[in-house]
């Protein structure tokens, strides 16, 4: 789910736990890109609205997705603020 989570969370106000539950219902494995608020794209999304997303942090992502998935790996993307997560659903 590359370039998807920040759009669902910031643009559509979908809470991270709901995103994690939806992904877990669809697939036992996931590769998810976390894009932090410091990223230019998220700053652009937030420029036209009030930031009402206190849980939209990498820690909040780990917590929300960690309830449904085991974090297999977490890889910072070089020359970027973004991080790729390889996830395996908890059964």
Predicted features and spans:
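Short catalytic/ligand-binding loop motif for oxyanion handling, primarily in non-cytosolic enzymes
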Residues: 7-9, 38-43, 82-83
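A short, conserved alpha-helix within the catalytic core of class I
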Residues: 7-23
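Core SAM-dependent methyltransferase catalytic element
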Residues: 72-91
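Short secondary-structure boundary/capping segments
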Residues: 14, 45-51
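Short alpha-helix
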Residues: 51-72
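Conserved beta-strand signature within the Rossmann-like core of class I S-adenosyl-L-methionine
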Residues: 19-41
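A short beta-strand submotif of the Rossmann-like class I SAM-dependent methyltransferase core
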Residues: 1-5
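A short pocket-lining beta-strand/turn micro-motif at the edge of beta-sheets
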Residues: 26-30, 70, 83
